[in-house]
Amino acid sequence: MVVLLFLLVILLCPDSTNGNKLRKMLQKREAVEPSKPIVSVKESKANEFLNSLKRPKRQLWDRTRPEVQQWYQQFLYMGFDEAKYEDDMSYWKNQGRGGSEYYGGFHQHHYDEDAAIGPRNPYTYRHGAGVNYDDY
């Protein structure tokens, strides 16, 4: 009882520096009403600026550009063959796609089947083949 009375006295009596603590806790805080932000640019001007922003196009290897034509001529002069390049790319991209081939599909055999040491994978070895058919 004494403790309760002591707490009430502490909370209700005004403090010398802060005033009445209980009253301060219970009274509503008065917040300043938010004012409209001041905009320095009109909406039409802002929209005009934002609409004018366009993403720059990527630098594509456009063959109509003269420097790309020059590079391409240099590649051809150095021995670049576009058809062979496309064939090689399609071959290497499709290497792992089909697994239904008889020789495994993924491995291209560069070994000689009549050599003393054969392929490491026994399932890819053609039993009884006396000819390296990969050469044909």
Curated annotation (Swiss-Prot):
Record GO biological process: anaphase-promoting complex-dependent catabolic process; cellular senescence; central nervous system development; G1 to G0 transition; regulation of cell population proliferation
Subcellular location per the Swiss-Prot or TrEMBL entry: Secreted; Cytoplasm; Apical cell membrane
Keyword Cytoplasm tagged: yes
GO cellular component entries: apical plasma membrane; cytoplasm; extracellular space
InterPro entries named in the record: Augurin (IPR028173)
Positions of the propeptide segment: 20-56, 121-136
Signal peptide: 1-19
Keyword Transcription on entry: no
Keywords tagged on the record: Cell membrane, Cleavage on pair of basic residues, Cytoplasm, Membrane, Secreted, Signal
Family according to the record: Belongs to the augurin family.
Alphabetized PANTHER family for the sequence: AUGURIN
Function: Probable hormone that may attenuate cell proliferation and induce senescence in the central nervous system.
Protein name from the UniProt record: Augurin
